[in-house]
Amino acid sequence: MSINPLASKIAAPYARALFDFSVDQNLMHQITADFQNLEVFLNKTPDLTEYLSNPLISAKSKEEVLNKTLKSQINKETFKFLIVLVNRSRINLLEPIIASYLNLVYNAASVKMIEVSTAYAFTNLQKNTLIKKLKELTNAREIRLVITVDSSLIGGFLIKTNSKVLDFTIKNQLQKLAKHLDSVLEI
């Protein structure tokens, strides 16, 4: 979910324009659903992302691929937006545009996206407990978790929001202990 800051800056006006359009045309729910599904689809098909991002491939070829793969799957206006991105050579920014658009939607709806890295997969009870606590801390109406499993953390979890990182991992505790021992003990 981490995206190049320059790409985010370039993507922001496109996301804002689509967000404003979706609000004006009362299409926010459809376009948001399309983008959420598209985000998952692109993560599962890195070859398509690579193909669309390749500057050596013509806009016409990219348009044909989008016609075959997505036209029947998404809203007409979402598809038109993708074609605009292809024609303006900005389809390579699709992932940051999706992220920026979804952030605009979530901010408007008081939904917070929070990244959680954990050593082991959470149970539903653990997810629900974490969501409840995060709602209290952030005053958000809704919390969306993006959970990644990273066995190098040994145990515990790491929470990342836009402005904060909360590290409750065993790996972090061991690193702190090692630093403390290094400063206290002279060998």
Swiss-Prot record:
PROSITE patterns: ATPASE_DELTA. It is found in: Plastid, Chloroplast thylakoid membrane. One of its GO terms (molecular function) is proton-transporting ATP synthase activity, rotational mechanism. Disulfide bonds: none annotated. Its main location: plastid. The keyword Plastid applies. Keywords: ATP synthesis, CF(1), Chloroplast, Hydrogen ion transport, Ion transport, Membrane, Plastid, Thylakoid, Transport. GO terms for cellular component: chloroplast thylakoid membrane; proton-transporting ATP synthase complex. It comes from the Eukaryota. It holds the Pfam family OSCP. It is a peripheral membrane protein. Signal peptide: none annotated. F-type ATPases have 2 components, F(1) - the catalytic core - and F(0) - the membrane proton channel. F(1) has five subunits: alpha(3), beta(3), gamma(1), delta(1), epsilon(1). CF(0) has four main subunits: a(1), b(1), b'(1) and c(10-14). The alpha and beta chains form an alternating ring which encloses part of the gamma chain. F(1) is attached to F(0) by a central stalk formed by the gamma and epsilon chains, while a peripheral stalk is formed by the delta, b and b' chains. Belongs to the ATPase delta chain family. F(1)F(0) ATP synthase produces ATP from ADP in the presence of a proton or sodium gradient. F-type ATPases consist of two structural domains, F(1) containing the extramembraneous catalytic core and F(0) containing the membrane proton channel, linked together by a central stalk and a peripheral stalk. During catalysis, ATP synthesis in the catalytic domain of F(1) is coupled via a rotary mechanism of the central stalk subunits to proton translocation. This protein is part of the stalk that links CF(0) to CF(1). It either transmits conformational changes from CF(0) to CF(1) or is implicated in proton conduction. This is ATP synthase subunit delta, chloroplastic. It comes from Trieres chinensis (Marine centric diatom).
